[in-house]
Amino acid sequence: MKPSPRTPAHPRHPVALATFLVFGLAQAATAADDALLAAAPAGQHTLQAVTVTATMTEQEARTAPASVTVVTEEELAQRNAANLLDAVRGTPGVTFQGRQVGGRKTLALRGMEGKHTLTLIDGRRISASDDVIGHSDYQYGWLPMAAVERVEIIRGPLSALYGSEALGGVINLITKKPKDRWMASIGLSGATGLDSDTAADALRTSVYAAGPLGEQFNLAINAEKSYQGSTVLPEDRAQSEIEGNRTRSLGLTASWQPVAGHEVEFGVQDGLEKRDSDDINRTPTYYHNRYELDRTQKHASWNADWGNGWRSQLRAYRSDISIRNFRNNGVAATRPQDMRDSVVDGHASTRWGSHQITVGGEWRKEELVNAGLKNGQDEATHKALFVQDEFALGQNLMATLGLRGDHHEIFGSEVSPRAYLVWEASPNLVVKGGYGHAFKAPTLKQISPNYVGAEGPHSFLGNGNIQPETSNAFELGANWQAAPQLALRATVFHTEVKQLITYRLLQKIGPRSIYQYDNVDAARIQGLEAGFTWDITPRLQWNNDATWLHTRDKTTGQQLNDRPRVAWNSTLVWQVQQWRTQLGAETTGKQQSASGELPAYTLWNASVGRAWKLGGERQLHLSTGIQNLGNVRMQEESPNFGWAEQGRRFFVNARMDF
């Protein structure tokens, strides 16, 4: 007999509970410290965010030719971020879409699917597995957060620089770099579910160390091991609602400066992740389901400053991901799959009068091993050249023009132009906007005419005539420091997407449907991002960012599925010297799914953190808090949600820097 569904555990007043927790703790903390510490002036703790992703050159995010959000190392710790999804949640334009398996979800930028976001590590692309492997979310665990200095999020197309996949935007994980002396940090993070039915325990340990080896050599090492338990499905406790996982990763980077201005770097990042869940198939048969994901990225690079404004970079790197599935009770496992991306790229930049010119190229070979392909494998080669010009049109007006040409050995060529203007109207007002074309190449499964995927109840066939997905996007935005204590920001955007790849029904043979990949859909996505940061007092700051979306499937005339009409993130931050206390709310509005309309919901999070100086370079960082204060369970909000969230959990993070 199956157990009855549990009674919803939503507190009647989660806001009151959160406010008491956060500001009660903060009041106690400040009372203890006020005799020794003076309040920090507003903004004293905030450094100007920088980005290298928008143009491949470092510049302030405020005046960069793109819509940019930078998540700092401090914010990663405060969010208890275990992976990239945790790192970017709560940032403007980011929402989630379900993968229907194991509680998995992927991110969407401005309503564009996860497959339309290019993920980079220090500018190096990783294997884009989410569109190749069904129901997967494997792109978000390539790098431990202990090795990350910041995460740069670019909303809007950037194929003019990076090529395929950058329709919705680019997320670039910037790793920590060695300093002129040895530095190290040891981290320990734990979480425990306050309701064992909805949240599972977790534990994560990490080590990072970097420093010089003599005058010309540097070394950086990162290691992490983590455990996340699975949660049961309350309606059937023999099944898992959220899969568990165990991970271990190790990274090593060595660099050499043979002469001033030149650096040669070699590195490897390796990780193994094991996921476990209990499931049921259509028979119905209960079975234990395990996935093993083996990820490796190796790279070599040469960065050179030639003087007189000339700089160059040359890189070679390879990304590999191997997926293996194991099932018991006579249930057939999914096919083994191996993906490899081998890349050689480079670019050079120089100043020429008021122009900053960047030219570069890329050669990339993607390979896929899958039994559904002819001879069990396939490959495709990409070649590209690009040019970018940043120049002044006046004292306070900057223009960025870019053009990239990509050639794919199967479908042919695609040209991606870009034009952007940034007007610094005053020291307090920046207006910027532009246009960009972007594309996503078909996967090897989609474009291979001999591919047959027939593992589930349906069959999917490749199509040698398929074309890349393309988009044309426009945006116009402004950032205004309206008063010393108030910053306002807003951006409108409009995107036309064509040649969207989906599948069409060819025929039915008994209960089995036969589908073929094809370009059949077109869509329009437009909306508004707006927000403000208000220093209510020198100690108290209120951040708000909201995104309104209007979407349309131009083939059917219907709203696109899994795109919330409104997403609103609100955070109160109380900062007193080393103390940082915050209360956050992530509200996701109503949205349409394939099974009907999904209701709006809000996740509340609260945390308190502090850093202690222990003498010399030693610092102790502690943070603690509660995630999902309201204990929201997606399946109780609606059974049509395609993913799950951990229930109410208490967490503690500790990190020692020395």
Predicted segment positions?
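Gram-negative outer-membrane beta-barrel transporters
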Residues: G187, A392-N396, F493-E496, Q516-Q592, ...
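N-terminal periplasmic accessory domains that precede
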Residues: L84-A87, K105-A108, T119-L120, D137-G141, ...
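Outer-membrane beta-barrel signature, preferentially recognizing the C-terminal barrel domain
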Residues: T283-D305, Q337-R340, E424, H437-R489, ...
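Short acidic/polar hinge/loop motifs at secondary-structure boundaries
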Residues: R125-R155
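Extracytoplasmic beta-strand/coil segments of soluble accessory domains associated
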Residues: T53, L85-A128
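Periplasmic-side early beta-strands and strand-to-turn transitions of outer-membrane beta-barrels
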Residues: K179-Y291
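Conserved C-terminal beta-signal and adjacent last beta-strands/turns
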Residues: P8, A16, F20, L47, ...
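Surface-exposed extracellular loop regions of Gram-negative outer-membrane beta-barrel proteins
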Residues: L272-K274, G372-G376, E409-E414, W423, ...
